[in-house]
From Swiss-Prot:
InterPro entries: FAM21/CAPZIP, RCSD. GO terms for molecular function: actin filament binding. Residues 159-176 have a biased composition (Basic residues). The modification Phosphothreonine is found at T124, T243, T256. Residues 7-20 have a biased composition (Polar residues). Keywords: Phosphoprotein. It comes from the Eukaryota. This is CapZ-interacting protein. It holds the Pfam family RCSD.
Amino acid sequence: MEERPSETNSNVDSSAQPSVAQLAGRFREHAAVARETPASKPTRRKPPCSLPLFPPKVELGQNGEEKSPSGASHPPKIKVKSSPLIEKLQANLAFDPAALLPGASPKSPGLKAIVSPFHSPPSTPSSPGIRSHPSEAEEVPVSFDQPPEGTHLPSYNKVRTRGSIKRRPPSRRFRRSQSDCGDFRDYRAVEPSQENGAREENGDDVFASKSKDPGSPQLNQEAMADGVEGTPWSAEKPRRRNTCNSTEKPEELVRTPEEANAGEKVGQNPDTASQGHPEVQAPSQTGSPEAENGCGSPREETTPGEHTDTGKATEGTASEERVADEDRLGQKSPDANMPEEEGVVREKAPQTSSGKAEGTTIAEPDTKQKEEAPLEPSCSPGADHAAGEITSEIQNEKAVSMDDIPIEDTRM
């Protein structure tokens, strides 16, 4: 490393002796500058330093060997004086980072530092080490920082937003669809439930009348002793039955004669049919007028059907008690006479149905609708109270006959 600059110094001295023969004193003064020229020799490869040195050489061959170099040697030396200072500063600037890496002497890395930025072969050992680290430093954030920024972070956001988009609207759609479907299901469920509710209420009336039979003494005491207290219970049921839709009326009207016909089919003999038909007809009649009127109490409707079992003697007592109770409450007499007419018509109906075809029973509800239409104004606690007392007396007399009715016949 140190042999090359020594050889260059000897070459510079040999070449400078003939050129500085006339000006030996000046050359000795500038001997230090001549020794510093090895730093300028590598710089001759640079374009700015090489341009002023070549034209004096051309002048040496044309004009004269001694004159031209004297005039030509001084200006380039002056230029060299200014250049090495700048080159030293540049070499120091380029030398400080390069000197730390190899750890060599300050002179030789200084030469390499000057040569390195302009020549690829010497620059390859130093520059790749310098460039590799920043490239790695640049590549490391690219490899680790960009993936979370470019791929992972947007993917997390996208996944969350997509998940939210996939979750929320379906939930709202499902809620709306379920609410719509639920509304349709509610309407569909309410219609059969109301129909079933009307049937169950009809059945509850039958079971209530039957449940009163075994426990008749307690209910009869409450109805006879405290007749006014029995009216709220009879008045509550008509209010609850007002909720039945009008669409259910024809279905129940069609079913009531079918139930009556089923009661006829169960009876083997015409005598048993005539006995079982009015009893089965009574609960079926309780359902149809309740759905039609919505005000008629079950006790009002069960009494005329049960009059058929007792006969004309019970009708007379029932009519007298009704007239007495209605006179107390100030009701009209034609409303009280209507149930008696219904009882007479219902007495005639089972007799004709036992001997005639089933068409007579189907014609009965039409006549009942016409007769029960004027019964709507008679919806009052007085009529309910009167009906409650009559049913209590009749249930005492015919408790055994009502117990004999099978449950399946009423629910056909």
